[in-house]
Amino acid sequence: MAISETDTEFRSSDGAVIVNKSTGGTHFSTDGKLAVSIVANARRDGTSHVSIYGDAQGLLALADLLTAFASLDQESVSDKNCPNGEGVHTSLTSSTGLASSSITLNLGRLDAKGTHDQNWFLHHDAVSIVPLENAE
């Protein structure tokens, strides 16, 4: 999926708005269902894991968002929308399309724009993660 950038938004190749720059919101829209949870010590060996479950539409919407992030040329994104040293990223929450029982799911590029640092997110201030909005 190719991503195009205009002065006001990022759009996918099918014309769907992914990021509206005027509101700062990433749009995650699905008619399906998607739930994310952490299961701690499920196997009694002290390990935890993340579970992501959804119906077909919910999983396809997540796949589209992941594909959009993977396909995006971060180097061409304006510094206002993705500063040097950060990767494109966002958060999905229960108020933006996940099931009400879900935890927040942070998604983003591991490679930072400009520096290609793969540990940028470890030092990132979580307050600056772009909030999501439901697509109209």
Where are these regions (language model features)?
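Positively charged, low-complexity terminal tracts
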Residues: 1-136
